[in-house]
Design a protein with these regions (language model features):
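A conserved P-loop NTPase coupling/switch region
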Residues: 1-35, 41, 47, 65
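ATPase nucleotide-binding head domains, primarily ABC-like/P-loop NTPase cores
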Residues: 44, 51-284
Length: 284
């Protein structure tokens, strides 16, 4: 306060700052950008140091169409602990889609998230949660956890349709000559309609994505989707399953979260109803 009163200190500081700004201010934005990039790289280096068993991915050539495949060995979700269950995953080649079926809570959505998060890490230059991982340069589009909007008057189903339309439009822009392949991850889409129309709609959406030279995966409870005329040839089917066992006379359900080939052969919705007390024997 005394310096300000005697020497107008604030005015001197302002004058010096304006002088510095005119001399070096144009370069300051670049300095802060470089500092931010350095901080991000330090974070990636810290992740590599904290997870010595993770690996750096291999990036395939964009000129090789046969290399337009995402392939990982023992891929796990980076945010889960050491008890995570890893699976071997392959998305592609173009013209195919990975169709993931399985009962509730079996691991379908977690698989898609594991693939997506590891791809993001890979394209940042980070290590990934896998024993091996290869991919081409990718542009990722997802449909997960869609939300409706009362304020905008948009229902859940309409919000999902708009999101899918945006994904399809992006796929059309990413033709074979684009430097980045488009990858889509669709988690149990179009649940807000009846099964017959859902099969038709999902088949149409996936066909448009495949025709756009995109690669990707879709999870679903619809076991008949893989047999539809549009997708029967294109689908690579995998599934997750549950196991039931009696523990002290109580019927319990467990999951091993291991991905298996083919379409799911079991469902568990009615069994879950019984387990929470909503079975037929609980009507009274």
């Amino acid at each position: 306060i005394i310096l300000e009163f005697l020497f107008f200190w604030d005015a001197h500081v302002l004058f010096m700052m304006e002088k510095w700004k005119s001399r070096a201010g144009d370069r300051a934005r670049g300095w802060f950008s470089d500092l931010g990039e350095w901080e991000a790289l330090c974070s990636l280096a810290k992740l590599a140091a904290d997870e010595p068993e993770w690996v750096f991915p291999k990036v395939n050539s964009v000129d090789d169409n046969t290399a337009a495949i995402v392939k990982g060995t023992s891929v796990g979700h980076p945010l889960l602990n050491e008890d995570r269950v890893a699976n071997d995953v392959q998305l592609g080649p173009p013209g195919t889609v990975l169709l993931v079926t399985g009962s509730n809570m079996s691991g379908k959505s977690t698989l898609l998230r594991s693939v997506g998060v590891n791809i993001v890490l890979a394209q940042m230059g980070s290590v990934v949660c896998a024993k091996s991982f290869s991919l081409p340069p990718l542009h990722i589009e997802t449909s997960m956890r869609i939300a409706d909007s009362l304020a905008d008057g948009v229902s859940f189903f309409m919000a999902e349709l708009k999101r899918l339309k945006a994904i399809v439009d992006t796929a059309k822009k990413h033709d074979a000559n684009n430097p980045k392949r488009m990858l889509f991850l669709l988690d149990e889409i179009l649940q807000g309609t009846n099964s017959r129309e859902r099969q038709i709609a999902v088949s149409r959406v996936v066909r448009k994505l495949i025709d756009g030279n995109a690669i990707g995966a879709i999870s679903t409870h619809d076991l008949d989707l893989a047999t539809t005329d549009d997708l029967a040839v294109a689908c690579q089917t995998v599934h997750f399953a549950e196991q039931f066992e009696d523990v002290d006379g109580v019927r319990t359900m467990t999951f091993d979260y291991q991905m298996r080939q083919g379409i799911a052969e079991t469902t568990n919705a009615l069994k879950l109803l019984e387990m929470v007390g909503l079975g037929e024997e609980d009507d009274d």
